[in-house]
């Protein structure tokens, strides 16, 4: 368990105090993949770097388990950083070392015996799919391969927590998907707590269990990804979701002017995504429907579907009640 208790961070620049992170309270459970999303300058990098004290907090407390990280001395901090691995946007590999040498580096610093280092490096390179590249140098690798080296290096000391600081933002979409798949696999197989920061809701949707949304250094929304993604409350969150779904809400509402009737957005979650609920309720209530937009996708391992439909004729109130009774979330866009 990672607990932020009124944790905050400020800087003094030219005699002025700049607040990077306002006091916040947050809990991250053991074994979770927890996402932190925000635009540039929102405070997300500051937040994640407070966990291993690459940034020093101005005030508040940070607990990992029962240990107060904010109270650790230098010896305790070194021990903490062996339990908290980190990967970075720009990989931060040592160009003069081979792939194997980069992965071995934290073990060498810890004074691990050579035979144990060699065995651990071989195990980790196999886990990230780079066993054939052990003797190559970073300059000979693709971006995705470099990030896999970074992941292997971060896992070398068998950490309990893995911090991912914009780990996929420098990668193309296909490589991003493969790295996210690897992180999800590591979470399942090793039970690691993963804290991931990003400015892309699509990354959150693919791998995270819960998410926190930051805006101008403030925590504005948090909850399970299914809830936050499908029913965003804060304007910042709604913008992230619209960008991820490539939906222009203003354009969509202009399209509404071309159709009559009551317009609703129906959200299906889990196995109900594949049930013929719309057709059944239309028959039962006598309503006609016009599908204006729709999609079926997944949030991590959970299928979901969304339909925007115009309802005409029949008993529309009964149809709405029928959708709710079937476990469908109904949002009235025009009554």
Curated annotation (Swiss-Prot):
Cellular location(s): Cell inner membrane
SUPFAM superfamilies referenced in this protein's UniProt entry, alphabetically: ACT-like (SSF55021), P-loop containing nucleoside triphosphate hydrolases (SSF52540)
InterPro entries, alphabetized: AAA+_ATPase, ABC_transporter-like_ATP-bd, ABC_transporter-like_CS, ACT-like_dom_sf, MetN_ABC, MetN_ABC_transporter-like, NIL_domain, P-loop_NTPase
Key word Translocase present: yes
GO CC annotation terms, alphabetical: plasma membrane
Residue sites binding ATP per the record: 38-45
ABC transporter domain span: 2-241
GO MF annotations, alphabetized: ABC-type D-methionine transporter activity; ATP binding; ATP hydrolysis activity
EC number in record: 7.4.2.11
PROSITE patterns, per the entry: ABC_TRANSPORTER_1, ABC_TRANSPORTER_2, METN
Top-rank taxon, per record: Bacteria
Catalytic activity, reaction form: L-methionine(out) + ATP + H2O = L-methionine(in) + ADP + phosphate + H(+); D-methionine(out) + ATP + H2O = D-methionine(in) + ADP + phosphate + H(+)
Keyword tags: Amino-acid transport, ATP-binding, Cell inner membrane, Cell membrane, Membrane, Nucleotide-binding, Translocase, Transport
Family membership: Belongs to the ABC transporter superfamily. Methionine importer (TC 3.A.1.24) family.
Its job: Part of the ABC transporter complex MetNIQ involved in methionine import. Responsible for energy coupling to the transport system.
Name listed for the protein in its UniProt record: Methionine import ATP-binding protein MetN
Gene name of the record: metN
């Amino acid at each position: 368990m990672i607990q932020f208790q009124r944790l905050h961070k400020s800087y003094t620049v030219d005699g002025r105090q700049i607040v990077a992170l306002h006091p916040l309270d947050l809990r991250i459970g053991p074994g979770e993949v927890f996402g932190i999303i925000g635009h540039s300058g929102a405070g997300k990098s500051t937040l994640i770097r407070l966990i291993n004290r690459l940034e020093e907090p101005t005030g508040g407390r940070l607990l990992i388990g029962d240990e107060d990280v904010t109270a650790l001395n230098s010896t305790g901090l070194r021990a903490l950083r062996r339990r908290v691995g980190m990967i970075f946007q720009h990989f931060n590999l040592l160009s003069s070392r081979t792939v194997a040498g980069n992965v071995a580096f934290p073990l060498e610093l810890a004074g691990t015996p050579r035979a144990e280092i060699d065995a651990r490096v071989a195990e980790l390179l196999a886990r990230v799919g780079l066993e054939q590249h052990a003797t190559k140098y970073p300059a000979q690798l693709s971006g995705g391969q470099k990030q896999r080296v970074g992941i292997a290096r971060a896992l070398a000391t068998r950490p309990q927590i893995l911090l991912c600081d914009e780990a996929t933002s420098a990668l193309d979409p296909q490589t991003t998907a493969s790295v996210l798949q690897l992180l999800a696999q590591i979470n399942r197989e090793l039970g690691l707590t993963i804290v991931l920061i990003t400015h892309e809701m699509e990354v959150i949707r693919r791998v995270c269990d819960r998410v926190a949304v930051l805006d101008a250094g403030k925590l504005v929304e948090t909850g399970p990804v299914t809830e936050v993604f499908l029913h965003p409350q804060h304007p910042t969150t709604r913008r992230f979701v619209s960008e991820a779904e490539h939906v222009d809400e203003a354009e969509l509402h202009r399209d509404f002017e071309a159709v009559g009737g009551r317009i609703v957005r129906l959200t299906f979650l889990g196995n109900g995504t594949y049930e013929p609920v719309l057709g059944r309720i239309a028959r039962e209530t006598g309503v006609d429907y016009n599908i204006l937009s729709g999609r079926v996708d997944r949030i991590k391992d959970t299928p979901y579907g969304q339909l925007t439909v115009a309802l005409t004729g029949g008993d529309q109130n009964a149809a709405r009640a029928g959708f709710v009774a079937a476990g469908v979330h109904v949002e009235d866009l025009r009554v």
